[in-house]
Amino acid sequence: MTLCFVTSISCCTSAQTFTLTSQDLSGQFTGKFIANVFGCTGGNKSPQLAWNNAPTGTKSFAITMYDPDAPTGSGWWHWVVFDIPANVFDLKQGAGNAAVQLMPVDAIQSLTDFGIPGYGGPCPPENDKPHAYIITVYALKTAHLGIDKTATPALVGFIINQNLLAKASLIIYSKR
């Protein structure tokens, strides 16, 4: 079962709402976006994402994918990307795989809770409640966060929040 919700939060007044969309996530994760670990046998491709109406002053973007329902006591970070140039407004399907080089120049994918940089698809435990997968794009007031691909999700999140102008999210629920 997969449901999709869209949310947007802006730190400043704007005539247009900062939004995040995906041509790939129109109601459910398909096998190509599911992880290929922990008993899941998906294709582990990151979804296509697009955003628009970034606030004035945006100098870069960051993207995260987070599962707050993971049975860890602290959730699970599936994807962390930052230093996406301000003139980029989408990521192609599969951009989360560094080997295919679809990520914009200068963008950095840092460590996830899988212990490596790059996209790690959803794979909730069997027979668990539906998990929320929150994909968020952040409009930032700095061009570079000043960290590299070895940064932990917590450190990236801290620096993102210090530089936040606006954010928009997709929330997808998935159950195995």
Identify the role of each PLM range:
Residues 1-10:
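Bacterial N-terminal signal peptides
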Residues 12-176:
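N-terminus-centered regions that define maturation/targeting leaders and the start
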